[in-house]
């Protein structure tokens, strides 16, 4: 599995601010959007271009470069992934949106999809999953499996922080996906929180406890 930890100083600086215990909802939300925007720029760097012909400003036909294929679909994992969508839209404002909701079954401890609204022609699009944290990897693995079952063939993932345990699990389950993250953190604690991590990103984005 391709794993890219973005080392850009602006990404590291902004992520450092997000780790503060005293951070406000407004600041956490803003930084989530800004880092997602920077990561989206990195993800799209490898997109294939094609030449198309348009009518230029001089009234003559000219060739320009455009990204090849259908517009990507951004796939936020509910609910925290919603806070990352605007960062993607800054670079891909015409992106389609496919939403996936997961909950953990108390008996099996496995993620179960409770909601999925996917766009059409997934087999012709890049699917960009966004979720602030990759902890155990359970929800991410289930989301990738759901997308593949629906026809998706090109799946990329953006997270703000990732645990080594989650990366390993994802790589074993889906070695063909690509992961772009602002940080590979140290480990998971006994409560399955990423250390040093960000705390509960969903609560911090939406101002809940």
Swiss-Prot record:
Entry EC no(s): 2.4.2.9
Cofactor note: Binds 1 Mg(2+) ion per subunit. The magnesium is bound as Mg-PRPP.
Catalysed reactions, semicolon-separated: UMP + diphosphate = 5-phospho-alpha-D-ribose 1-diphosphate + uracil
Cofactor or coenzyme needed: Mg(2+)
Regulation: Allosterically activated by GTP.
Function: Catalyzes the conversion of uracil and 5-phospho-alpha-D-ribose 1-diphosphate (PRPP) to UMP and diphosphate.
Name the UniProt record assigns to this protein: Uracil phosphoribosyltransferase
Originating organism: Francisella tularensis subsp. mediasiatica (strain FSC147)
Gene name tied to this protein: upp
């Amino acid at each position: 599995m391709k794993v890219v930890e973005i080392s850009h100083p602006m990404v590291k600086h902004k992520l450092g601010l997000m780790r503060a215990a005293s951070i406000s909802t407004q600041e956490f939300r803003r930084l989530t959007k800004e880092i997602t925007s920077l990561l989206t720029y990195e993800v799209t760097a490898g997109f294939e271009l094609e030449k198309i012909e348009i009518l230029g400003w001089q009234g003559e036909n000219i060739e320009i470069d455009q990204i090849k294929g259908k517009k990507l679909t951004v796939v936020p994992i509910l609910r925290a992934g919603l806070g990352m969508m605007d960062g993607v839209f800054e670079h891909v404002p015409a992106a389609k949106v496919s939403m996936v909701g997961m909950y953990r079954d108390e008996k099996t401890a496995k993620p179960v999809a409770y909601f999925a609204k996917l766009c059409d022609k997934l087999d012709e699009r890049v699917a960009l999953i966004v979720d602030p944290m990759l902890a155990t990897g359970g929800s991410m693995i289930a989301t990738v499996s759901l997308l593949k079952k629906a026809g998706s063939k090109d799946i990329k993932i953006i997270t703000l922080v990732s645990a080594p345990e989650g990366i390993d699990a994802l790589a074993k389950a889906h070695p063909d996906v690509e992961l772009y993250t602002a940080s590979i953190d140290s480990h998971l604690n006994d409560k399955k929180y990423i250390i040093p991590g960000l705390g509960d990103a969903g609560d911090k984005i939406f101002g809940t406890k």
